[in-house]
């Protein structure tokens, strides 16, 4: 599991309860824990540009329809709640996600 990869997640609490894709946010160097920090996705078209980063489906990310990363729903789950690897975000999409997280957490200056 590497930062920027998309995995399926299910069986965790709250927003990761039903099966859905999730982006790995945790730094690759922090891998000795039994948990991992993720950002779950939704296909709900709710307009919230700062908190819902749209990700268009493509071959690299493995998504089959437009999804939105819910940066206001960052959570940590047990690694055994992750299913299979779906794909990986490209650099530009990761930069958009990182920027949205910085703003949401008040770290954007």
Features from the language model and the residues they span:
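Conserved functional hotspots at enzyme active or ligand-binding sites that engage polyanionic ligands
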Residues: 1-109
């Amino acid at each position: 599991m590497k930062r920027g990869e998309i995995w399926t997640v299910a069986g965790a609490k709250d927003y990761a309860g039903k099966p859905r894709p999730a982006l790995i946010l945790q730094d690759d160097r922090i891998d000795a824990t039994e948990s991992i920090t993720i950002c779950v996705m939704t296909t709900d078209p709710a307009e919230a540009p700062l908190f819902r980063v749209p990700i268009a489906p493509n071959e690299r990310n493995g998504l089959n329809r437009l999804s939105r990363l819910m940066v206001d729903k960052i959570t940590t789950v047990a690694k055994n709640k992750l299913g299979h690897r779906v794909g990986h975000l490209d650099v530009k999409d990761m930069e958009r996600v990182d920027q949205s997280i910085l703003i949401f957490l008040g770290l954007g200056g």
